[in-house]
């Protein structure tokens, strides 16, 4: 692993290079909007919850590199790159908390074969500058530091960053099995050590899970052999999973659980056929009542953002051109709509926003074009 501070000193000049001439529409943007990064060189740009740091993944000598900048000065604070001998390279990540950044790596498991994402993950601490591997696709022990206890294998998915617990995150581990696997297991993962503490079994084979903001409610959906979806939920204090009484005639992609733990939102298709419209729906956990929030029609690249109370704020999608539907008008949805008007015909996506909504990062692009990042 190599620190790249010396290699990316010119980065500041790149960041401050204005490219407003790239689009006549940019002149309509407020002065607080600045071109941040050139999309051909950088990706996975995000701002930390406090707004203090900006992170990105860049290519340096064909190696994926994590770079963390100070938001105020736009100077490089830290960077991480792995060399060829390490057999891994940084692929992407996100902020866990104000000072913790979790990132994934691609693993070269066989010489001459393209590196793959097997779920290997690291945590980098901006306070201590400590880099900790928290997950390895070959498996890890329940007590990682002492290499004791049962060894756990599989794919690790983050369920919740546990806003009231700075030391742990909630994760689900799905064992690697050719036939679809066994039920996933839910653990608490200690960020400083990578140690795992078992919480509960998942409700069904192949189940995917979501939590509300506090992780007080977990909702799971699992595919069945007849191509339908079954649903379950479990709240803090429950000793077992509860079936949700609903017969959904198709696949369901869960998106969010409301903060009060009463509703789960997701995308589905209830009609048959390859051109069936896609729906944003809500499902009441206790009654199983499903309501359609929005019918998108037969479209692509649907993205739904959630706001106050964990309910939909706005959605964007691609039909004959990029479109937006605002469900609850707030600062974020207003800024996104403004960007879409300024960049008519381009895909606009919000990639990150800090807790105070004072810093928002946007990507503006189109099919076949990497595009550009902007910070508002």
Predicted regions and their residues:
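Bacterial N-terminal signal peptides that target proteins for export
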Residues: 2-12
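Bacterial N-terminal signal peptides
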Residues: 12-21
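Beta-propeller folds
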Residues: 27-360, 365-371
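Pre-Walker A segment
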Residues: 372-376
């Amino acid at each position: 692993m190599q620190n790249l501070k010396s290699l990316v000193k010119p980065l500041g000049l790149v960041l401050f290079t204005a490219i407003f001439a790239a689009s006549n529409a940019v002149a309509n943007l407020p002065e607080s909007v600045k071109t941040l990064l050139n999309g051909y060189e950088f990706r996975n740009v995000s701002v930390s919850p406090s707004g203090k740091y900006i992170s990105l993944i860049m290519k340096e000598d064909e190696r994926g590199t994590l770079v963390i900048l100070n938001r105020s000065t736009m100077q490089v604070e830290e960077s991480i790159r792995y060399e060829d001998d390490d057999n891994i390279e940084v692929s992407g990540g996100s902020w866990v908390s104000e000072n913790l950044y979790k990132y994934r790596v691609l693993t070269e498991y066989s010489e001459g074969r393209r590196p793959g994402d097997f779920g290997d993950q690291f945590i980098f601490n901006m306070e201590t500058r400590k880099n900790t591997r928290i997950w390895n696709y070959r498996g890890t022990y329940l007590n990682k530091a002492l290499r004791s206890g049962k060894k756990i294998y599989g794919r690790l998915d983050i369920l919740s960053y546990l806003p009231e617990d700075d030391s742990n995150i909630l994760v689900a581990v799905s064992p690697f099995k050719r036939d679809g696997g066994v039920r996933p297991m839910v653990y608490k993962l200690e960020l400083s050590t990578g140690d795992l503490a078992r919480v509960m079994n998942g409700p069904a084979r192949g189940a995917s899970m979501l939590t509300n903001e506090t992780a007080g409610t977990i909702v799971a959906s699992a595919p069945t052999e007849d191509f339908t979806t079954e649903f379950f939920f479990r709240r803090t204090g429950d000793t077992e999973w509860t079936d949700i009484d609903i017969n959904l005639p198709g696949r369901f992609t869960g998106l969010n659980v409301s903060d009060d733990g009463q509703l789960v939102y997701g995308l589905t298709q209830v009609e048959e056929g390859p051109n069936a419209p896609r729906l944003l729906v809500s499902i009441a956990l206790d009654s199983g009542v499903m309501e359609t929030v929005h019918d998108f029609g037969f479209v692509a690249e649907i993205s739904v953002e959630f706001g106050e109370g964990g309910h939909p704020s706005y959605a964007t999608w691609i039909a004959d051109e990029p479109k937006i539907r605002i469900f609850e008008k707030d600062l974020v949805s207003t800024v996104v709509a403004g960007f879409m008007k300024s960049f008519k015909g381009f895909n606009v996506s919000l990639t990150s926003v800090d807790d105070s909504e004072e810093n928002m990062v946007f990507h503006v692009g189109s099919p076949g074009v990497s595009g550009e990042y902007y910070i508002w």
